[in-house]
């Protein structure tokens, strides 16, 4: 936290509907962070292949798309994680999963999922293979 004052001049937070904002801007970003929920459920409109394609066009070359994914049933149900990773793999060349404990907010497991077209190096990633992948999330429109 001591480093935050040094980053304030470089950090710009935007509070808006993420998908609508990205659709309406020509700006490009080094990172886009998706940590959105409707109650305990993820905001599906930001997790679909259509939304991720919009986000990708808003990233600088080599930029990183980061999303927080919460499991259900005390970490037993990772179906949304599997679908989110599957969908990200359709849009980005490289997708990694990093487990994040969140004991202060309950028993659910959190995962940080990072995607980019550039291979970045991250520690403590969870390996996965094609058997882990499930369904591509799509708009219902």
Language-model segment annotations:
Residues 94-141:
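Soluble small-group transferase modules, centered on the S-adenosyl donor enzyme superfamily
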């Amino acid at each position: 936290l001591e480093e935050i004052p040094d980053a304030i001049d470089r950090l710009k937070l935007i509070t808006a509907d993420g998908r609508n904002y990205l659709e309406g801007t020509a700006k490009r970003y080094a990172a886009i962070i998706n940590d959105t929920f409707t109650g305990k459920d993820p905001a599906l409109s930001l997790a679909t292949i259509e939304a991720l394609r919009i986000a990708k066009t808003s990233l600088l070359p080599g930029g990183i798309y980061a999303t927080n994914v919460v499991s259900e049933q005390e970490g037993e149900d990772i179906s949304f994680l599997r679908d989110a990773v599957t969908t990200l793999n359709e849009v980005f060349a490289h997708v990694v999963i990093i487990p994040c404990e969140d004991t202060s907010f309950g028993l659910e497991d959190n995962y940080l999922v990072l995607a980019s077209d550039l291979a970045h190096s991250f520690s403590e990633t969870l390996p996965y293979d094609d058997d882990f992948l499930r369904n591509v999330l799509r708009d219902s429109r």
